[in-house]
């Protein structure tokens, strides 16, 4: 696309924003660090989501309850702290396609993965191995390797890393199925990312879950890049367990709380091991101070400590946005927005050392396009995009820059600015 054509395309992007406006008005958008626009073109919501405008007032309301009531706020606050986490249960269940008893919001993501693996990674005999993606987020890799060591196993031989075929960037579901069919009797746990953090590939969760369970393995999912990004139906897909964070697409703020899903078939299993604490016991008898926990037959049994109220408020505020907009509408806009960014990138990447590595099929990706650069540093390119053009993206060294057109608040003009910035920053070779 020539420069004059790119200029004309800006008008088309503005028309698309008029016809398909999204919900940007509900969020605070940071100012641009450079370029000719006042606001940043923020395409880093897959790293940290923007702050909903309602969050500040709601957080201050919880702070005011603490100031005004002290300890009495546990029962007397407008939103009493003792059952506060229950306010998140129904909207969380709707978000991930679960029954309310199957979900709870608590802790952070990797902590929850460890707590879940206490229950669901139970190596016995030859069935000891854990399957993850070769490009899994490092924290997941560290977690499963440490779980192997905890059980006295060699992590190098216990952890199976699924890699794409030579010359390809993403996994094929058929290859995952083939591995599970051929070696399933040695696999105790399959733990994959629902959307791969690096490539943006949306895994075929129902198919892989069915294949893993048919092989006799437990199947869990890290949904950090899937929750709030793509529609989920965890109960119907028969997923054993899942966990996700809330600070990316769910916009709960840096380090925001994690969500947990445990399928209802496991909830009343008395043989399932689990770490317990004060909040593991049923609420009705919690303050009887019994020395023996009486866990409820819900995902709340995986709780250990009382929840941080000031961290739960932003999650609640964000979930209200998702309830009001709906995942179906968000997904439809996401497909349109990401498709437009893909088309724009196709206009500016020819002749430049840039290649989109995210699947081209909209059904195999969420709100992310990852671009591999052929020369230079990904971090340096992301820095130039931000400082010279006000485009905020996320670099993953050594050579990937990730762009996330989040359907809640990203615009078609944001996507145009990405293409314009890349055309101005990356030279044609």
Curated annotation (Swiss-Prot):
Q: Which residues carry this modification: N6-(pyridoxal phosphate)lysine?
A: 248
The EC class name is: hydrolase
Which annotated residues bind pyridoxal 5'-phosphate? Answer: 109-110, 137-140, 222, 225, 247, 278, 306
In the UniProt record, the gene name given for this protein reads: kynU
Q: What are the recorded GO MF terms, alphabetically?
A: kynureninase activity; pyridoxal phosphate binding
Q: What Gene Ontology cellular-component terms does the record carry?
A: cytoplasm
**Which domain of life does this protein belong to?**
Bacteria
Protein name (Swiss-Prot/TrEMBL): Kynureninase
Give the transmembrane ranges.
none
Identify the InterPro entries for this entry.
Kynureninase, PyrdxlP-dep_Trfase, PyrdxlP-dep_Trfase_major, PyrdxlP-dep_Trfase_small
Q: What is its EC number?
A: 3.7.1.3
Which family, according to UniProt? Belongs to the kynureninase family.
Keyword Hydrolase applies: yes
Function, as annotated, reads:
Catalyzes the cleavage of L-kynurenine (L-Kyn) and L-3-hydroxykynurenine (L-3OHKyn) into anthranilic acid (AA) and 3-hydroxyanthranilic acid (3-OHAA), respectively.
Q: Which Pfam families match?
A: KYNU_C
Pathway the protein contributes to: Amino-acid degradation; L-kynurenine degradation; L-alanine and anthranilate from L-kynurenine: step 1/1; Cofactor biosynthesis; NAD(+) biosynthesis; quinolinate from L-kynurenine: step 2/3
What biological-process GO terms show up in the record?
A: anthranilate metabolic process; L-kynurenine catabolic process; L-tryptophan catabolic process to kynurenine; NAD biosynthetic process; quinolinate biosynthetic process
Signal peptide start-end: none
Chemical reaction(s) catalysed = L-kynurenine + H2O = anthranilate + L-alanine + H(+); 3-hydroxy-L-kynurenine + H2O = 3-hydroxyanthranilate + L-alanine + H(+)
Question: Which of UniProt's keywords are assigned here?
Answer: Hydrolase, Pyridine nucleotide biosynthesis, Pyridoxal phosphate
Which cofactor(s) does the record list? pyridoxal 5'-phosphate
